[in-house]
Amino acid sequence: MATTKSFLILIVMILATTSSTFASLEEMVTVLSIDGGGIKGIIPGTILEFLEGQLQKMDNNADARLADYFDVIGGTSTGGLLTAMITTPNENNRPFAAANEIVPFYFEHGPHIFNSSTGQFFGPKYDGKYLMQVLQEKLGETRVHQALTEVAISSFDIKTNKPVIFTKSNLAKSPELDAKMYDICYSTAAAPIYFPPHHFVTHTSNGATYEFNLVDGGVATVGDPALLSLSVATRLAQEDPAFSSIKSLDYKQMLLLSLGTGTNSEFDKTYTAEEAAKWGPLRWMLAIQQMTNAASSYMTDYYISTVFQARHSQNNYLRVQENALTGTTTEMDDASEANMELLVQVGETLLKKPVSKDSPETYEEALKRFAKLLSNRKKLRANKASY
């Protein structure tokens, strides 16, 4: 009798734990963050194609899209462009680009975006005209509020000297941020040295006009928008009734996938003190930008990893990054076909590499694990909505 009673208690405990697990999964906030890096966006593009393919297989749905699974998708520079591609609706209110269309986009348009050199010593390397043209063609008149999920795209206003973050959830307080997606995408990609800054205005319903003078979002997030995306997700969890059980900064109920565009094992380029001693201001400016981007990426990953580990939620965070780029693959504007093919190979090879030295799990296996969580959560939410 005692054995039977103990068995029943055990069953109740298992059911309670299972119910709690599913409830936790259902209310988990899912976040996708994509780094900047110019043409190196091909690397996360390759990873996204794999992830979306896994979701389609698991849900037996060829029309499944990443925006169906992530509560927040954020990006800066080329990552902001990818964010727009997979969240901007087409005429059927579905993402205008599937993940398997990202890499072909770079192959088709990259050589033109990074080919219209101004030829000026003083001024940006490229005029940005083709970039704006293709953004207007692809994104049309779509504005932030129409995005299919919450977005977080960063830029920096050189007139106000403040970062500008474009999100859906902030429009009630700041309606002037409901800009056209092509203006936002050009702004977040307008890297100093490479493209001209972007000026545009928005008009609110009460007739107010707001002016923007924007440059690359990497100035605000230093290339890695993961912390920004996580901050937006935290605010979403606090304000959206669907996540009422989530406490502030409860990373146990956060699922974060952060995609890098690759870096060298130390920095994009390495130097010696003897070399640097001969540099002038311009050479230092270029080197500092490269060093800052690389160092910031490492520190952001270190900080997020530490926080998730402290909350015993390390499996809820995955940083996918290639840290051993060499040669032309380190360049953000080498859009030659040969280099783009190399970048595809980098992404495909990365999938087979271990996530860390201490873990035998490969990125491919980790992404499949994430895909399973995303798929199960979507099904749980769909079941709840049907009641």
Curated annotation (Swiss-Prot):
EC number: 3.1.1.-
Cross-referenced PROSITE patterns: PNPLA (PS51635)
Domain annotation PNPLA: ranges: 32-230
Glycosylated sites: 115
SUPFAM superfamilies (alphabetical): FabD/lysophospholipase-like
Localization: Vacuole
Pfam families noted in UniProt: Patatin (PF01734)
Signal peptide range: 1-23
Coiled coil regions, renumbered to chain: 322-385
Alphabetic keyword roster: Coiled coil, Glycoprotein, Hydrolase, Lipid degradation, Lipid metabolism, Plant defense, Signal, Storage protein, Vacuole
Intervals of motif GXSXG: 75-79
Motif interval(s): DGA/G: 216-218
Intervals of motif GXGXXG: 36-41
Tissue-specific expression: Tuber.
A molecular function GO annotation: nutrient reservoir activity
GO biological process, one term: lipid catabolic process
Enzyme class label: hydrolase
Active site residues of this protein: 77 (nucleophile), 216 (proton acceptor)
GO cellular component, one term: vacuole
PANTHER family: PATATIN GROUP D-2 (PTHR32176:SF85), XYLOSE ISOMERASE (PTHR32176)
Record comment regarding domains: The nitrogen atoms of the two glycine residues in the GGXR motif define the oxyanion hole, and stabilize the oxyanion that forms during the nucleophilic attack by the catalytic serine during substrate cleavage.
Function: Probable lipolytic acyl hydrolase (LAH), an activity which is thought to be involved in the response of tubers to pathogens.
Family listed: Belongs to the patatin family.
Additional observations: Patatin have a dual role as a somatic storage protein and as an enzyme involved in host resistance.
This protein's name: Patatin group J-1
Organism encoding this protein: Solanum tuberosum (Potato)
